Amino acid sequence: MKLIVLMSIEEYADVLRKILINHRIPVFSETDVDGYKLSESEHLHASWFSGKQSGIYSHMFIAFVNEQKSDEVLSAIEVYNESHEQLNPLRGFQLDVERGV
């Protein structure tokens, strides 16, 4: 069994939903995430008192699937990213699930 984790900025969350539906993933979870990206020159302490940095509205999806479905979904994300040039591509990875209860 695999746990797949997929992420996108808010504008592309529907794309990930469609990929999951098109690949017949029967159960998945979705949550809103505030994403932060610091440039290499930025340090957390550099702006310690200067106020809150605003995040980028993102979405994270998770699903428990078999290895074949994981490969299908991650391949679909690769195909989408290759055919759509964007600053924030869709992201996805899989984790092995050793045991579940």
Task: Report the location of each language-model feature.
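Positively charged, small/polar-rich N-terminal and surface patches that mediate targeting and assembly
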Residues: 1-101
